[in-house]
Amino acid sequence: MDSLCAMAPSSQNMAPDTQLRVENSQGLALSSHCHEVVVVGGGLTGLVTAFMLRQKGVDVAVVERENRIGGQIHTYHEGDFTFESGPSTSALSHPEVAELFELLDKSTLLKARKEAHARWIWYKRNFVEMPHGLWSGLTTPLVTLYDKFRLLAEPFRQRGVNPDETVGEISRRRLGNSYFRNFVDPFVSGVYAGDPDKLVTRFALPKLYALEQTYGSFIRGAIQKMRTPKTERDRLATKEVWSCEGGMERLIEQLADGIGRERIYLGVTSAVLRPEGKDGWELRGVVTTTEDAMLDVSELSTACDEHLSDEKEMQTAKNNFVCRAQRVITTCPAYALPQLLSFVESSLLKDVSTLTYAPVVQVAVGFKDVQGRSFQAFGGLVPSTAGRKVMGILFPSSCFSHRAPEGGALFSVFMGGVRHPEWVEASDEAITETVLSELQTMLGLPRDLQPDLVRIFRHPRAIPQYEASSVERFAAIAAIQSQYPTLTLAGNLRDGIGMSDRIKQACGL
């Protein structure tokens, strides 16, 4: 810790997480913070990372730009409606998710009702349920007769040789055009809000890519994996859809409590990181927290600089933030890294920060009474060729309890994506009118049935797109981390975009 707190004569004898205080002739107190590890970014990845480190007894702090934690996760409660402005569900696709809730409060984990197993696809003029067995697969109108027969030969097709083959290319090659059009394309819109002909399979859908590369076939690989004995830990990855009791923000609150809220510094803007000494780091920023912030960092995060002398400098310094650490983990978006890591070679930063993000408009629509109508499914996805103005509609109140009043319904509607980015700039009136029209047409809601809730959330840079440029991005990340072994670049710029992916990555940092 000597190199981290060198400004204090006896810093080697001080406990971690110490505020060092100095005074000038005017008696103005300044402070600086020292931790073993600093996590930059208070979204899900950053919070789980800090929580897991605290479980190991590591002295860790979280630095967040906004005056709230959670990143895109934000739960709202209005009347009897509970809705999200960001991700609302995920799948138990990794054991780390179940293990995390074991460490927190198991009762927080809310598994979806059985209705969530049903998924709808818009086909011609109606929603059609996706097949979930042999018979439904043979009879579904979503796949042409030609492609149904063609699928029989899938186990015998050769492996792809292009490592940058896109999701669209591999699915058409192995499955056929109708599978691509009615399954893969809407799935990619629902997960990435992206274009399957731009997303590289080995980055965007690594498990699918591994099936072909390891077993030579999707079908053969899936069968082989089902036959492979699973460990007790493997069985924790049940693939079930999950959320949290009371909304996703409950998870954020529990993580904050587990970390220790005094270790979370909010409202730190203009953050700049720089190497300090042989094996240390210094993070400087400006504290812009408000009084009603979730954590009071006005007391916890002010600057420490022995060389400030006059009153003007001291007054400015009161708003500064300094934190020193032995290790730094960044979990912030790729576009925030050039300012934060200005000491890194510009060519490497460019390869990391040019990551493309899909813009998404998310609209919560609630009805207190849907006049007996039932929507027994997880939701409906829309192929890009269908000519609709929405990418998909989720049914949170069908999947989870207490999302809407009894007899009512809550819908989460998604628009925009890489194909229609213009929606993020559209007016509230245009979005509302379009969404209600689509709900009426696609779900059969009466035109005289007025919603009791409409809330619009715009996310100009919502979802990272794992396109061909990911090769350069991952190489640049590896080069930076090799040059600076105590610096880790994490977050959804690599290792997957879903909440379960974020939890898995964080548990391994």
Predicted regions and their residues:
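Conserved flavin/dinucleotide-binding core of flavoenzymes
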Residues: 3-4, 17-20, 24-31, 131-135, ...
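Mid-domain catalytic core of redox enzymes
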Residues: 17-18, 31, 56, 266-411, ...
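N-terminal Rossmann-like FAD-binding beta1-loop-alpha1 element of flavoenzymes
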Residues: 35-62
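Conserved Rossmann-like nucleotide-cofactor binding loop
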Residues: 45, 68, 335
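Glycine-rich FAD pyrophosphate-binding loop
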Residues: 54-77
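A short alpha-helix-loop-beta-strand transition element characteristic
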Residues: 75, 98-120, 178-182, 357, ...
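Dinucleotide-binding Rossmann-like beta1-alpha1 core, especially the glycine-rich loop
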Residues: 79-159
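Active-site/ligand-binding neighborhood in enzyme catalytic cores
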Residues: 153-273, 280-281, 287-313, 324
